[in-house]
Amino acid sequence: PFLNPSVLTQLDLPIPNRDSTPLLLEPLNLNREFIPSKDIQAYRHLYALDKLEGTFWQGYIKMPLFKLHVQVYQPDTEKIKGTVFLLHGYLEHSGIYQPIIRELLDQGFSVLTYDLPGHGLSNGNAASIQNFDHYQQVLHAVHQYVKNADQLPQPWLGIGQSTGGAIWMHHLLEYAQLRKNPIVERVLLLSPLVRPAKTSWWHNPVGLGIIRRIKREVPRHFKRNNHNPEFLRFVRLKDPLQPRMMGMDWILAMSKWM
């Protein structure tokens, strides 16, 4: 459903980017109607988020380490089945999850999703993180911000893709050890990050030790990890919010987390 960014130019709309677009986000406020600015309209149009039915809110949540881009969607239905916390994977962002957001809304669920630090419209070094524990701090900060929101009724469910799945696994295991109830009642893990593929160069500690001494980031290699060629082409060639480099800090943080 995504557009070629050139369409935005034809419509006299700005193309989203990680430098200027986040500066135009307002604090997330679920207590009033959200009216997007021209730049946010462009973002929503590019990723077909403006085609979703229901009510939406968009903005940022400020926390000690990060300024996080958050989106909330509520379906047009009298009885909402619950709320899904949708977490994307590494080198992705929440905008490209429009199809699954649409499906969840059609099924009668509210949806909360956010860009991980260093991704999409959230701040932080691009495609990087200093410590995987920061992902847990972000999850808890978002939970504290929205836990009493009428738009996000119980039960709360979690969906996580790749690194998003790792975030949920970390949360569930940590809370199990503490004998505390987790944020969500159930989770759906999509290709969760458990360990890097053995074919990945950073799976080799010798290679990782050498590269970390000479590089702060390495080029990203786009893989065919989807059966939709149009989607793969958009991600590789057209999406202005796709990172082109992988941060070594993220790779090292992942290695320590494992």
Predicted regions and their residues:
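An N-terminal hydrophobic leader/cap segment in hydrolases
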Residues: 1-62, 67-76
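Short beta-strand element of the alpha/beta-hydrolase
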Residues: 80-89
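Catalytic nucleophile-loop/oxyanion-hole region of alpha/beta-hydrolase
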Residues: 90-96, 119-152
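Conserved alpha/beta-hydrolase
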Residues: 94, 101-124
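Alpha/beta-hydrolase fold nucleophile elbow
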Residues: 150-162
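Alpha/beta-hydrolase-fold enzymes
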Residues: 161-250
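Conserved serine/cysteine hydrolase catalytic core
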Residues: 255-258
